[in-house]
């Protein structure tokens, strides 16, 4: 087991009607003005936004709104939020929505706290936020795990880039998680969320590291729990137990718990970011589903034992010790069949990705052949291109 630091400063309020506490929670920060950040009209139509704002009024907390966040949150709205925050004197950001809203809120908080730096520089590796504004979240979608993660991913529509910014400064001060708020999530978005949650854990599971059987057991439990919960949610969208398990899994999958003692790099996420950066209409979870099995088939021989453990402990397969690769291939096929069964794509062609764009995707992912994606099997430009080609042919 490698040395590690585990820190989760986010305070979680979990359960029915916990969002009604938001006014009192934010009042503890003594803000001058709150930016209430959200997505489309659903937050308003559902009555959630009105509830939240009434809670703020009850505590005499001033606020200003900014809606319009889209899936794969975009830089122009982040810049708009920063300018609005400067004008209004915002010193607290409240995200009401899913991972895209939360990431956009994190970027705005970073930009407001560091006005001398262009916020996109934080996502290009040119600068690191030295401070940030306090922020909180009311979660309405179990998927990205942004409510407890140190990650923030923003898309730049001008360049087609989708880039992450990572650090403790991105942690929410609090997260309110009421599973009831996810009852109206569509089957497709529920499935996308299930993939994203599982993938945050599966990717960590396949990062280099040894003798992490406790971390492994936690990860395996998260993966299997999400699979069960997603199936139950798709059968009955108002199954509170299933929605609750999905929501809590979302948080645990991306707060660092399932990587303790192992190295960390989300390789398939890096592959997918280029896809949804170039094709912003692609849902992140769908992109991950379309890529993961091809990546798995390309890299598994670099660590046969690890993949056998996954096949046995996650999919319940008996290991064929004479032909171990058959066991692994069966597990990957089962994962692929599972994606298809919940309406997820198993290849890039299903997402509308053009074959002529594969080389550009590989160039962008490898930063014009200047970086490799590190894991059990390092992936240079040529490897990345092969994986994109394999994923294209699967669809």
Task: Give short role names for the model-derived ranges.
Residues 1-92, 348:
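ATP/NTP phosphate-donor binding region
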Residues 16-17, 38-40, 69, 96-98, ...:
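Fold-independent oxyanion-binding glycine-rich loops
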Residues 51-52, 82, 101-115, 148-149:
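Short Gly/Thr/Asp-enriched flexible loops that form oxyanion-binding sites at enzyme active sites
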Residues 90-106, 140-146, 281:
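Glycine/serine-rich anion-binding loops at beta->alpha junctions
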Residues 114-214, 309:
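A glycine/threonine-rich phosphate-anchoring loop and its flanking beta-alpha core
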Residues 204, 208-334:
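Active-site segments that bind and position negatively charged phosphate/pyrophosphate groups
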Residues 314, 318-395:
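C-terminal charged capping/lid subdomain of soluble metabolic enzymes
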């Amino acid at each position: 087991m490698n040395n590690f630091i585990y820190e989760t400063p986010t305070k979680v309020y979990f359960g029915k009607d916990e969002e009604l506490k938001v006014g009192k929670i934010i009042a503890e920060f003594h803000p001058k003005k709150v930016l209430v950040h959200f997505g489309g009209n659903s937050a308003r139509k559902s009555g959630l936004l009105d509830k939240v704002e009434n809670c703020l009024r009850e505590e005499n907390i001033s606020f200003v709104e900014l809606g319009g966040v889209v899936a794969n949150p975009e830089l122009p709205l982040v810049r708009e939020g920063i300018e609005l925050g400067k004008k209004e004197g915002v010193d607290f950001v409240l995200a009401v929505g899913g991972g895209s809203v939360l990431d956009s809120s994190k970027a705005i908080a970073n930009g407001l706290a560091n006005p001398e730096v262009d916020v996109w520089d934080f996502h290009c590796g040119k600068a690191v936020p030295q401070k940030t504004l306090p922020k909180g979240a009311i979660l309405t979608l179990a998927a990205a795990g942004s409510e407890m993660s140190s990650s923030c991913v923003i898309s730049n529509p001008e360049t087609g880039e989708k880039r992450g910014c990572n650090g403790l400064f991105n942690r929410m001060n609090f997260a309110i998680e009421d599973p009831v708020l996810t009852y109206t999530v569509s089957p497709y978005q529920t499935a996308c969320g299930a993939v994203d949650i599982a993938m945050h854990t599966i990717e960590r599971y396949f990062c280099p590291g040894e003798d992490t059987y406790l971390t492994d057991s936690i990860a395996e439990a998260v993966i299997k729990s999400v699979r069960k919960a997603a199936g139950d949610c798709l059968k009955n969208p108002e199954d509170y137990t299933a929605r609750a398990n999905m929501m809590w899994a979302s948080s645990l999958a991306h707060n660092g718990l399932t990587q303790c003692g192992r190295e960390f790099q989300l390789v398939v996420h890096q592959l997918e970011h280029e896809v949804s950066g170039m094709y912003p209409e692609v849902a992140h979870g769908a992109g991950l589903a379309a890529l993961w099995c091809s990546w798995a088939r390309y890299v598994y021989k670099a660590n046969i034992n690890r993949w056998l453990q996954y096949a046995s402990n996650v999919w319940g397969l008996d290991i064929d010790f004479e032909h171990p690769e058959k066991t692994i291939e069966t597990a990957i096929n089962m994962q692929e069949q599972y994606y298809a069964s919940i309406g997820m794509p198993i290849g890039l062609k299903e997402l509308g990705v053009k074959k002529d764009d594969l080389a550009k995707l590989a160039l962008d992912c490898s930063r014009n052949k200047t970086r490799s994606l590190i894991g059990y099997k390092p992936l240079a430009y040529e490897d990345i291109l092969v994986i994109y080609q394999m994923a294209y042919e699967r669809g």
